[in-house]
Amino acid sequence: MPTAPSRPFVRCKKTVLLVGEGPCEWAFLKHLVGLMQTRSGAFAAHVENAHGGSPDIVLHSTKKLLAQRAYNVCVVLMDTDRPWPTSLARNIGKTRMVYVRATPCLEGLLLQIIAHKRSSKNTTTDACKRLVYDAYVVERHRTEPAAYAKHFPIELLLKSRERCPALDEILRELQ
């Protein structure tokens, strides 16, 4: 009697949901995923935009996204220019949550990655935005992932992991 053909081995990928506070965070996260993801890679990533607002609104949007599909990990990138809730869920359902602080904003994180000489953790949000949009990212294209390609190549991002813990947290989940 012939035996049934064996079923092919299917490896399950780690699924990652990345949520950006607004359209600029979405574009930067989309740029990172584009650099790190391959078709046969170890993870499948989906990037969403929470459409701005307070951290509470961003977390509410994230919970709604997690109710639609199952993910292994959810990375939420938010600015610190507004106060965060005092307690953050470590898990939502079966999804592990990772909260990444862009201090004071995404543009501040970008300046940390580049190691810009005139920026520090005490630089204001407006000053960070002015520095980034004057020198690195064309302001009218800041919501497009391709706008980050020239000044934020994979080599720089990997080299910046040690001095930029927020970037390291994101990249760790994309491996």
Report each predicted region and the residues it spans.
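C-terminal accessory helical subdomains adjacent to catalytic cores in phosphodiester-
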Residues: M1-T15, W26-N49, D56-Q175
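Short hydrophobic beta-strand that contains or immediately precedes a catalytic carboxylate
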Residues: L17-E21
